């Protein structure tokens, strides 16, 4: 009876989780505040190879359009598009069917990026290729625009070795006889509909994570905002004194972090280009005054790279929260730290998962012992319970009262076997989110045919073996179920779970296999000891 209840509870929770995932992907977050879009959101770009420069360090390769100095392409040199692919992953890209750019500029009365006729300034550079040297600590790439009034605008891109954060610095030399009034902005724009070559998990519900916009403000450490909301013109207009804006996808993030020292406040906004199907999230600073005959420097940071929590936390507060661990982030984060610590010693993520499974089973062993002890006691009481059902079957209320009195007399908690299920489910889900949300596990091999623990088993060997272990567990305990129909349902449950697990990350299936094997050993040990104690 206990095992039957446990399986049904676990199945109910599991299916509820899958339905919740599907609902999340379809539901819309209602409008926070609708705002009229400003024209600078829609700044045009001219993609001409002769007006592009390339800058790179050892982890990033950036293509910059000299019209406005926007970053139109960003390749991550340590990450490939897919497993065994020679092509580096392009996080930012500008193509005919897909646009993903990081734009920045100066707007307002004296801004270069004219919001009236949408013309971008054409910067100049000394050459078209810049690369960080082997022993250099910093690569500073200046692009320059000299206005007719004698004002010099220098836009510096600063890269450091091994770093994914790009410092974007405006150096403005106001040699005119008037005060300048302008605002700095930074925005991300991306085509909402992915082309097939970028939508690699479209057919696998189990491996999909959040893709959309996000921000941090004075009132919210971290908020996700769906592309669907932006496409429906449910636009954000948030005044904040600090924070950042970002666009997220599985394992990777692009984020603008404004310098709060040069602006008393910033406006976080969203917009949507209906004709192009492009979503925009950005920030605009408050008014910046630059006196005549003075020099002024405005800085901002741009993160273009993997969701590495420790590094992102150093770039901006709360930026590390963009790692999508779902609603159980408070469990996934410590589990990942523990898993990383184990990996530092073992060097293999698969064996690290196995070891953390042993640790979880050891921690929950008292609950497992209580579960199977309760099951055994319930089985011993089954003849007495059947007798009560026979005697009081005509009076359901009296029968329930007598059965509860029997439980109390024998010191049995009828719900004692359910607690391990409720403990196991959050651990299972937090591991699931950790495996599909941690970039460290992307393309991480285990053994033999398992080349990527974050992806499904290509040959379905692990899910089938997991189903066999589950079948063995429930079969060895099915003596508690007397109803033949219920027995058939319980025998069918492993098959249902096997089908679900076909598309789950192989690392998660590995965890469940090891957990089941340990459960089988614990089950035999606990039941054997119980029988010995009963004979004494």
UniProtKB/Swiss-Prot annotation:
It comes from Buchnera aphidicola subsp. Schizaphis graminum (strain Sg). NCBIfam families: PRK01318.1-1 (NF002351), PRK01318.1-3 (NF002352), yidC_nterm (TIGR03593), yidC_oxa1_cterm (TIGR03592). GO terms for cellular component: plasma membrane. This is Membrane protein insertase YidC. The gene is yidC. Interacts with the Sec translocase complex via SecD. Specifically interacts with transmembrane segments of nascent integral membrane proteins during membrane integration. Keywords: Cell membrane, Chaperone, Membrane, Protein transport, Transmembrane, Transmembrane helix, Transport. Required for the insertion and/or proper folding and/or complex formation of integral membrane proteins into the membrane. Involved in integration of membrane proteins that insert both dependently and independently of the Sec translocase complex, as well as at least some lipoproteins. Aids folding of multispanning membrane proteins. It is found in: Cell membrane. It is a multi-pass membrane protein. One of its GO terms (biological process) is protein insertion into membrane. Its main location: membrane. Belongs to the OXA1/ALB3/YidC family. Type 1 subfamily.
């Amino acid at each position: 009876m206990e095992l039957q209840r446990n399986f049904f509870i676990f199945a109910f929770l599991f299916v509820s989780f899958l339905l919740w995932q599907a609902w999340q992907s379809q539901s819309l977050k209602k409008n926070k505040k609708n705002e009229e879009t400003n024209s600078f959101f829609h700044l045009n770009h001219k993609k001409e190879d002769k007006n592009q420069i390339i800058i790179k360090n050892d982890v990033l390769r950036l293509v910059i359009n000299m019209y406005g100095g926007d970053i139109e392409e960003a390749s991550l040199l340590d990450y490939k598009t897919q497993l065994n692919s020679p092509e580096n992953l392009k996080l930012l890209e500008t193509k005919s069917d897909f646009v993903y750019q990081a734009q920045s500029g100066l707007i307002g009365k004296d801004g270069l990026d004219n919001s009236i006729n949408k013309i971008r300034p054409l910067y100049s550079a000394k050459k078209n290729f810049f690369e960080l040297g082997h022993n250099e600590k910093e690569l500073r790439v200046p692009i320059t625009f000299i206005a007719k009034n004698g004002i010099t605008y220098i836009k510096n891109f600063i890269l450091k070795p091994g770093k994914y954060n790009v410092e974007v610095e405006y150096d403005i030399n106001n040699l005119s006889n008037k005060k300048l009034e302008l605002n700095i902005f930074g925005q991300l724009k991306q085509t909402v509909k992915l082309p097939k070559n970028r939508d690699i998990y479209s057919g696998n519900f189990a491996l999909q994570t959040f893709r959309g916009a996000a921000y941090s403000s004075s009132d919210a450490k971290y908020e996700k905002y769906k592309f669907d909301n932006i496409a429906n013109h449910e636009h954000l207009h948030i005044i904040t004194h600090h924070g950042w804006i970002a666009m997220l996808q599985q394992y990777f993030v692009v984020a603008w972090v404004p310098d709060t020292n040069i602006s008393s406040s910033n406006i976080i906004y969203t917009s949507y280009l209906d004709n192009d199907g492009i979503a925009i999230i950005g920030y605009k600073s408050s008014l910046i005054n630059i006196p005549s005959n003075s020099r002024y420097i405005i800085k901002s940071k741009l993160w273009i790279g993997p969701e590495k929590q420790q590094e992102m936390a150093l770039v901006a507060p709360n930026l590390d929260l963009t790692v999508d661990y779902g609603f159980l982030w408070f469990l996934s984060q410590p589990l990942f730290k523990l898993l990383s610590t184990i990996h530092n010693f073992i060097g293999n993520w698969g064996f690290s998962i196995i070891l953390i499974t042993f640790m979880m089973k050891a921690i929950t062993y008292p609950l497992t012992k209580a579960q199977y002890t309760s099951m055994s006691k319930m089985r011993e009481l089954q003849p007495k319970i059947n007798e009560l059902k026979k005697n009081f079957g005509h009076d359901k209320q009296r029968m329930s009262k007598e059965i509860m009195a029997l439980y109390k007399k024998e010191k049995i908690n009828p719900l004692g076997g359910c607690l391990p299920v409720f403990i196991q489910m959050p651990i299972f889900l937090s591991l699931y989110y950790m495996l599909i949300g941690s970039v460290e596990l992307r393309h991480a091999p285990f053994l033999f045919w398992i080349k990527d623990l974050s992806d499904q088993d290509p040959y379905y060997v692990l899910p089938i073996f997991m189903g066999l272990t589950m079948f063995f567990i429930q079969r060895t305990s099915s003596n508690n179920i007397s109803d033949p129909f219920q027995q058939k349902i319980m025998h069918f449950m492993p098959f249902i779970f096997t089908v679900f697990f076909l598309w789950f990350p192989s690392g998660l299936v590995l965890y469940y296999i090891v957990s089941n094997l340990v459960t089988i050993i614990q089950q035999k040990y606990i039941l054997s000891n119980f029988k010995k104690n009963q004979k004494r």
